[in-house]
């Protein structure tokens, strides 16, 4: 339903939730949306044309001049329209503010290029040595990482789930690409230190970023130059059956694990490495 627009604060109350066979009603109390204007006014007619709903919008008596229309309600689409030069993690996650009790969407953002000097392109391979053509087929919606030779998780976006307000925070002040974007849009990004603590405590290591790093580390973990050149100790990324009958590249996943030498259980992102098909030895987890 987030692909559709909604009209709020009209003459009719909005259905909230049922209680004992009866509906509770409410009225939107947020600040999101754009006022539609008076009936048959230029502003109202413009919205009716834009939404392709002439009768519902232009002539409806259920709308008031201060009734608002909320557009671009999908959080990824909403944030991407403000910063189309960044790559967006396809898995935004919803958190509850510990102090405010409000709901927020957090999206990890990446700066990428395929023109970084002296950096090899990312060409991941699976356990059989074949190049991975996608990042998971229909069950993953990740942007194409292939051939990129630079990626950093340099920013995050926070979207107010009620009002739709979007805020961008820079998490890597040393990233040259983000520095270039900030020079052109100086008011778009805020320092990560200004993010409220109730949101900052929910930040996690992106599994999309770990997947890219694991793809590179599978080759470059080798320290012996001879073995590195021959590729005899190269690790591979495994495949798995996930929501289909076809093998797909395995993505990192989050779990709670008690790591050796640590003080207790931790929330971590992990991905296994598989040996080449010609060997039978266990490799490693990252």
Per-range role (PLM):
Residues 1-286:
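Soluble extracytoplasmic regions of secretory-pathway and membrane proteins
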């Amino acid at each position: 339903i987030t692909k559709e627009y909604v009209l709020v604060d009209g003459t009719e109350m909005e259905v909230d939730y049922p209680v004992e066979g009866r509906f509770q009603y409410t009225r939107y109390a947020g600040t999101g949306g754009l006022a539609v204007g008076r009936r048959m006014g230029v502003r109202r007619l413009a919205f009716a044309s834009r939404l392709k709903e002439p009768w519902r919008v232009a002539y409806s008596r259920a709308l008031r001049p201060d009734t608002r229309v909320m557009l671009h309600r999908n959080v990824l689409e909403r944030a991407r329209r403000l910063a189309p030069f960044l790559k967006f993690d396809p898995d935004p996650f919803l958190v509850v503010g510990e102090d405010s009790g409000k709901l927020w969407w957090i999206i990890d953002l990446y700066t990428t290029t395929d023109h970084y000097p002296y950096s090899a392109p990312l060409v991941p391979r699976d356990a059989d040595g074949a190049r991975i053509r996608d990042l998971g087929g229909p069950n993953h919606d990740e942007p194409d990482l292939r051939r990129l030779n630079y990626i950093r998780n340099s920013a995050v976006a926070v979207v107010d789930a009620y009002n739709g307000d979007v805020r961008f925070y820079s998490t890597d002040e040393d990233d040259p690409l983000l520095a270039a974007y900030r020079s052109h849009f100086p008011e778009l990004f805020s320092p990560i230190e200004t993010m409220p603590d109730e949101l900052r405590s929910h930040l996690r290591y992106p599994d999309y970023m770990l997947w890219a790093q694991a793809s590179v580390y599978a080759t470059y973990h080798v320290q012996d130059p001879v073995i590195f050149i021959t590729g005899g100790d190269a690790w591979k990324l495994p495949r798995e059956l996930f929501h289909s009958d076809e093998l797909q590249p395995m993505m990192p996943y989050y779990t709670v694990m008690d790591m050796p030498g640590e003080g207790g259980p931790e929330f971590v992102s992990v991905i296994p490495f598989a040996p080449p098909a010609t060997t039978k030895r266990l490799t490693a987890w990252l």
